[in-house]
């Protein structure tokens, strides 16, 4: 959820990529950091998986290879969308919009209150009150 708040450090281009993606648009790759990380598939991840290309190096060496590219994708997001590092879990398919953090917290509090009210009703019914 925090990837999709206005206050996140993600670029608007990155957040739009998350909105458009589904859970099948992710891949587990070592291509950016050297450690397995779930991210959106793109030309970068596909190139690292292409037969004949080298395997990613271990951490921290792989990031020494890719670190400048990651920085460039944040600096020029519109021009680098096809190779950007977009770490995200399979929950990406549930992202629909960018919100303010306060709105997310308010929604969660309301959902909590509704859930506890429902549990109270179930408990009262079970106790025969």
Predicted regions and their residues:
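Conserved active-site-proximal phosphate/metal-binding subdomains
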Residues: 2-129
């Amino acid at each position: 959820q925090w990837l999709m708040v206005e206050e996140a450090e993600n670029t608007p281009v990155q957040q739009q990529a998350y909105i458009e993606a589904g859970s099948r648009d992710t891949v587990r790759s070592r291509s950016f950091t050297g450690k397995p990380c779930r991210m959106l598939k793109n030309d970068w991840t596909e190139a690292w998986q292409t037969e004949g290309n080298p395997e990613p190096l271990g951490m921290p060496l792989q990031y020494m290879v890719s670190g400048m590219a990651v920085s460039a994708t944040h600096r020029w997001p519109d021009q680098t969308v096809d190779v950007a590092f977009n770490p995200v879990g399979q929950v990406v398919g549930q992202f629909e919009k960018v919100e303010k953090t306060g709105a997310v917290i308010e929604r969660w509090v309301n959902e909590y209150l509704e859930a506890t009210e429902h549990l109270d009703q179930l408990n009262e019914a079970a106790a025969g009150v």
